[in-house]
């Protein structure tokens, strides 16, 4: 299945149903009074996280999703039926962004998590609501309000504990193959990895972490070179970044310069991401021997001013890989994921009671509404008309 991590869709909540202007007409009750019912509320649009999905491909071609409209009110005090809601299933880790305002509506980070993305319109009032001691035959009603309509940008960000950084051919995919059962493609040419992949690394019987591999970065990625930086968003939720460096590049490039390139591109993309804990890991030490690799690593670390720890491994042979994974596991257990506190729900600008109060002050009169019923009938219209009343 093709990996799609972005989709632009339009969601339309249902409009509220209009109120009804109607009067009770029964045998022996010549002045039955108003009995027009309220309309129904419009349907809402929700997103729900589903752990069985791993791509947004379902929204690549189908772009518009509309909830049901609330039914209009009816006579005999009948309230209109509420519009049907719709729920769109998305992968866990999906972020919803309003495409017009760029407001982040929310993140779906757990299976079954549900989020409202478009609120349905509120119902209109029937003429029964307007009766009073001085207005016994009201011919006023209110219409329902429109439902929200939004263009949503859906972005899938993988949920991983560890993120891999590095130039193309640094050995990131080989490392994931060494520590997990994942089998990303490995070859001796740049950009073998074209889409992100996940692997579960197990350390012992009951300890494990998830590692994410993304396509390699090159100089100028922030300006769109290579595959650009569109996949860096998948590292935003990682707790630690593993910067994998080829200690003896086949193109004879300077490893210290390569490290600086990645750090620069990372900083240009996001300062927050650049400030995450990073571990420097020198790979492919089997090509030159561990002693020479250690000497080269010390020189590189001194040149770039690296103050943290660093590791020497060979992902191809598995040398020192187990020790690295154990240290990663210890770090993850010592730094549990901090759950983002749910934002306090802000007061909605639209308030139900306020709307009804304003609507009753400015109702739609018989000169405004255009319902095709006899609710605007007057006594003058009774002349020459026979009424048939139901018992």
UniProtKB/Swiss-Prot annotation:
GO annotation (BP), single: ribosome biogenesis
Residues annotated as binding Mg(2+): 173, 193
InterPro entries: G_OBG, GTP-bd, GTP-bd_Obg/CgtA, GTP1-OBG_CS, GTP1_OBG_dom, GTP1_OBG_dom_sf, OBG_GTPase, P-loop_NTPase
Start and end residues of each Obg domain: 1-159
Cofactor list: Mg(2+)
Gene3D superfamilies on file: GTP1/OBG domain, P-loop containing nucleotide triphosphate hydrolases
Keyword line: Cytoplasm, GTP-binding, Hydrolase, Magnesium, Metal-binding, Nucleotide-binding
All copies of domain OBG-type G, residue ranges: 160-333
Domain of life, per lineage: Bacteria
EC annotation from Swiss-Prot or TrEMBL: 3.6.5.-
Bias type Acidic residues, positions: 365-385
Self-association state and partner proteins as the record states: Monomer.
Name the record gives this protein: GTPase Obg
GO molecular function: GTP binding; GTPase activity; magnesium ion binding
GO cellular component: cytoplasm
Localization per Swiss-Prot or TrEMBL: Cytoplasm
Keyword set includes ATP-binding: no
Family of the protein in this entry: Belongs to the TRAFAC class OBG-HflX-like GTPase superfamily. OBG GTPase family.
Function: An essential GTPase which binds GTP, GDP and possibly (p)ppGpp with moderate affinity, with high nucleotide exchange rates and a fairly low GTP hydrolysis rate. Plays a role in control of the cell cycle, stress response, ribosome biogenesis and in those bacteria that undergo differentiation, in morphogenesis control.
Region (Disordered), start-end ranges: 361-391
Residues annotated to bind GTP: 166-173, 191-195, 213-216, 283-286, 314-316
HAMAP family cross-referenced by the UniProt entry: GTPase_Obg (MF_01454)
ATP-binding recorded as keyword: no
């Amino acid at each position: 299945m093709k990996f799609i991590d972005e989709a632009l869709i339009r969601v339309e909540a249902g409009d509220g149903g209009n109120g009804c202007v109607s009067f009770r007409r029964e045998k022996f009750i010549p002045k039955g009074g108003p009995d027009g019912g309220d309309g129904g509320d419009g349907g809402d649009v929700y997103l729900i996280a589903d752990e069985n999905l791993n791509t947004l491909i379902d929204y690549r071609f189908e772009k518009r999703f509309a909830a049901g409209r609330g039914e209009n009110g009816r006579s005999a005090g009948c309230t209109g039926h509420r519009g049907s809601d719709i729920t769109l299933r998305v992968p866990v880790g999906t972020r919803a962004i309003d495409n017009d305002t760029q407001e982040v509506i929310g993140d779906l980070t757990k299976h079954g998590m549900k989020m409202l993305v478009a609120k349905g319109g509120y119902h209109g009032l029937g003429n029964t609501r307007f009766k009073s001691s001085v207005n016994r035959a009201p011919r006023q009603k209110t219409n329902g309000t429109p439902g929200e309509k939004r263009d949503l940008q859906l972005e899938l960000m993988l949920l991983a504990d560890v993120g891999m950084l590095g130039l193309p051919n640094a050995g990131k995919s080989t490392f994931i193959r060494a520590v997990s059962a994942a089998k990303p493609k490995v070859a001796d040419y740049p950009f073998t990895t074209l889409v992100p992949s996940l692997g579960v690394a197990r350390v012992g019987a009951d300890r494990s972490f998830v590692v994410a591999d993304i396509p390699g970065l090159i100089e100028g990625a922030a300006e769109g070179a290579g595959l650009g930086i569109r996949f860096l968003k998948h590292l935003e939720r990682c707790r630690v970044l593993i910067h994998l460096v080829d200690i003896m590049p086949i193109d004879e490039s300077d490893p210290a310069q390569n490290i600086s390139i990645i750090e620069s591109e990372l900083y240009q993309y996001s300062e927050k991401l650049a400030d995450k804990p990073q571990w420097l890991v020198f790979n492919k030490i089997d090509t030159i021997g561990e002693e020479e690799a250690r000497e080269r690593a010390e020189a590189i670390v001194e040149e770039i001013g690296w103050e943290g720890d660093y590791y020497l491994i060979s992902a191809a042979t598995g040398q020192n890989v187990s020790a690295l994974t154990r240290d990663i596991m210890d770090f993850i257990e010592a730094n549990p994921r901090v759950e983002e506190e749910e934002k306090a729900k802000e007061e909605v600008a639209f308030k139900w009671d306020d709307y009804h109060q304003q609507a009753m002050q400015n109702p739609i009169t018989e000169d405004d509404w255009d319902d095709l019923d006899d609710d605007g009938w007057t006594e003058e219209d009774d002349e020459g008309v026979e009424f048939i009343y139901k018992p």
